[in-house]
Curated annotation (Swiss-Prot):
Organism classification: Bacteria, Bacillati, Bacillota, Bacilli, Bacillales
EC annotation from Swiss-Prot or TrEMBL: 1.3.1.14
Gene3D superfamilies according to UniProt: Aldolase class I
Essential cofactor(s): FMN
Enzyme superclass (EC): oxidoreductase
Assigned protein family: Belongs to the dihydroorotate dehydrogenase family. Type 1 subfamily.
Pathway assigned in UniProt: Pyrimidine metabolism; UMP biosynthesis via de novo pathway; orotate from (S)-dihydroorotate (NAD(+) route): step 1/1
Entry keyword annotation includes Phosphoprotein: no
Residues noted as binding substrate in the record, renumbered to the chain: K43, N67, A68, I69, G70, L71, N125, N190, T191
Residues holding FMN: S19, K43, A44, N97, N125, K163, I189, G215, G241, G242, G263, T264
Gene designation per UniProt: pyrD
Organism from which the protein derives: Bacillus pumilus (strain SAFR-032)
GO terms, molecular function: dihydroorotate dehydrogenase (NAD+) activity
Protein name stated in the entry: Dihydroorotate dehydrogenase B (NAD(+)), catalytic subunit
Source domain of life: Bacteria
The record's free-text note on cofactor binding: Binds 1 FMN per subunit.
Length: 310
């Protein structure tokens, strides 16, 4: 009842640890078998290694956290030689998150990493708010987003999903531009831009000044955006933003997501993903659903059916 079929991804269940909140899985593999996961979104990979932003770069908030990590990663060579081979021991498809500062960077990383035998899809990171160049610059302009998507699609050996930024005036317009450029799916949402101030100094707590807000605080925004975008495109969506339990997963499915990524909750409870997987069948049954597929987009498909009958 939990299996989901998406472009490039045959998922045993719809639960995926989100990129940036799971590293490359090594720490979590000491706690449970990663093969139970529907898929794994690995940490963003750039062409060259990145050390990220200066510290402090994480701050707790009332209902979540701010981060300004800055895409710290070992670079394409390190991921291809060390991380992906290590992940081959697990029976779960890998989604490689690709980031860069310019189109050529994305293209080179995508072309090479998509050929790794356990990478089943790419997640194009065009929405990171914590880097000075690239990242969110591509995610806030429909034409730039479409051009980058097409460039990556032209070289990728696997389906391409594009990660959407919530820090835009019209997320539907950007989603449609990306779909028109050939994207196979969308992941959404990335973090909202936020800030915390130190009351003693009056200065921002984060060295980067601003950071990406994640956690329960952003879930209503994420659900609303998934609900809107899923009605405007025909490609599948992997929803994310503030998921803490199986009820949250069901809410994203009803809004129109076909699978759900769990991010910040992994920092609070490292067992959260397997716990949600175990809990989900009972939650679906409690609300009268016999499968994940039956839930997808129910919130608006129900309205459309009622309107059609009227």
């Amino acid at each position: 009842m939990l299996n989901v079929e998406l472009p490039g991804l045959s998922l045993k269940n719809p639960i995926i640890p989100a990129s940036g909140c799971f590293g490359f899985g090594r720490e979590f593999a000491s706690l449970y078998d990663l093969s139970v996961l529907g898929s794994i979104m690995i940490k963003a990979t750039t062409l060259e290694p990145r050390f990220g932003n200066p510290t402090p770069r994480v701050a707790e908030t009332g209902a979540g956290m701010l981060n300004a990590i800055g895409l710290q990663n070992p670079g394409l060579k390190g991921v291809l030689e060390n991380e992906l081979p290590w992940l081959e021991q697990f029976d779960t498809p890998i989604i490689a998150n690709v980031a860069g500062s310019q189109v050529d960077d994305y293209v080179e990383v995508a072309e090479q990493i998509s050929q790794a035998k356990n990478v089943h899809a790419l997640e194009l990171n065009i929405s990171c708010p914590n880097v000075k160049t690239g990242g969110i610059a591509f995610g806030t302009d429909p034409q730039m987003a479409a051009a980058l998507t097409k460039a990556v699609k032209d070289v990728s050996s696997v389906p391409v999903y594009v990660k959407l930024s919530p820090n835009v005036a019209n997320i539907v317009e950007i989603a449609q531009a990306i779909e028109s450029a050939g994207a196979d799916g969308l992941t959404m949402i990335n973090t909202l831009i936020g800030m915390r101030l130190d009351l003693k100094t009056g200065k921002p707590i984060l060295a980067n000044k601003t950071g990406g807000l994640s956690g329960p605080a952003i879930k209503p925004v994420a659900v609303r955006m998934v609900h809107e975008v899923s009605q405007a495109v025909s490609i599948p969506i992997i929803g994310m933003g503030g998921v803490q339990n199986a009820e949250d997963v069901l809410e994203f499915l009803l809004a129109g997501a076909s699978a759900v990524a769990v991010g910040t909750a992994n920092f609070v409870n490292p067992f959260i993903c397997p716990e949600i997987i175990e809990e989900l069948p009972n939650v679906l049954a409690a609300y009268g659903y016999s499968s994940v597929e039956e839930c997808i987009g129910r919130s608006w498909k129900h309205e459309a059916l009622a309107h059609h009958r009227a």
